[in-house]
């Protein structure tokens, strides 16, 4: 069974990596799918995010990394994936993700959404929080994979 783990991953966090690693034990293949959203101004280009995620997941033989435009369910059909993998941190995540899961099923009844509860040490963590801390010169080394720390630091010069 193939699962898609979609997101912006701008940047990938240890919370994302935790979901990828745990998901890799549940599914034959996981495709980490970076959404190209032209309406957002990302910190890192799609190409850079793909490179970062590939580096962070190179130890997982059943994980591939790709990018896509458009609807997630259309991408899932194209890749013959029947599962969308999502991480849940807090109750508000569940409400939003459940609504999206129902929407996706109205678009394609061949897809299921599987939710994994985020490990408690990452329950507060998001890419937005990482960027906010880094912007003001705070340490993010306990929030992101070590291999992307230099990328983040170079994006936010010291104040």
Curated annotation (Swiss-Prot):
Class of the enzyme per the UniProt entry, highest EC level: transferase
One Gene Ontology term from the biological process aspect of the record: coenzyme A biosynthetic process
GO terms assigned for molecular function: ATP binding; pantetheine-phosphate adenylyltransferase activity
Residue numbers binding ATP: 8-9, 16, 87-89, 97, 122-128
The keyword Cytoplasm is annotated on this UniProt entry: yes
Swiss-Prot/TrEMBL site (Transition state stabilizer) positions: 16
Residues annotated for substrate binding in this entry: 8, 40, 72, 86
Chief place where the protein resides: cytoplasm
The EC number(s) this enzyme carries: 2.7.7.3
Subcellular location as annotated: Cytoplasm
Keywords: ATP-binding, Coenzyme A biosynthesis, Cytoplasm, Magnesium, Nucleotide-binding, Nucleotidyltransferase, Transferase
Keyword Cell membrane attributed: no
Family: Belongs to the bacterial CoaD family.
Protein name per its UniProtKB record: Phosphopantetheine adenylyltransferase
Organism of origin: Synechocystis sp. (strain ATCC 27184 / PCC 6803 / Kazusa)
Classification of source organism: Bacteria, Bacillati, Cyanobacteriota, Cyanophyceae, Synechococcales
């Amino acid at each position: 069974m193939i699962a898609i783990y979609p997101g912006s991953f701008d940047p990938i966090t240890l919370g994302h990596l935790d979901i990828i690693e745990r998901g890799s034990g549940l599914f034959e293949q996981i495709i980490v799918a970076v959404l190209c959203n032209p309406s957002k101004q990302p910190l890192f280009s799609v190409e850079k995010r793909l490179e970062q995620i590939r580096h962070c997941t190179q130890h997982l033989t059943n994980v591939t990394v790709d990018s896509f435009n458009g609807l997630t369910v259309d991408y899932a059909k194209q890749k013959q994936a029947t599962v969308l993998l999502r991480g849940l941190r807090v109750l508000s995540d569940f409400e939003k993700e459940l609504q999206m899961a129902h929407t996706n099923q109205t678009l394609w009844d061949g897809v299921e959404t599987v939710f994994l509860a985020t490990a408690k040490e990452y329950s507060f963590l998001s890419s937005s929080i990482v960027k906010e801390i880094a912007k003001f010169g705070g340490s993010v080394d306990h929030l992101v994979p070590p291999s992307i720390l230099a990328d983040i630091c170079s994006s936010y010069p010291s104040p």
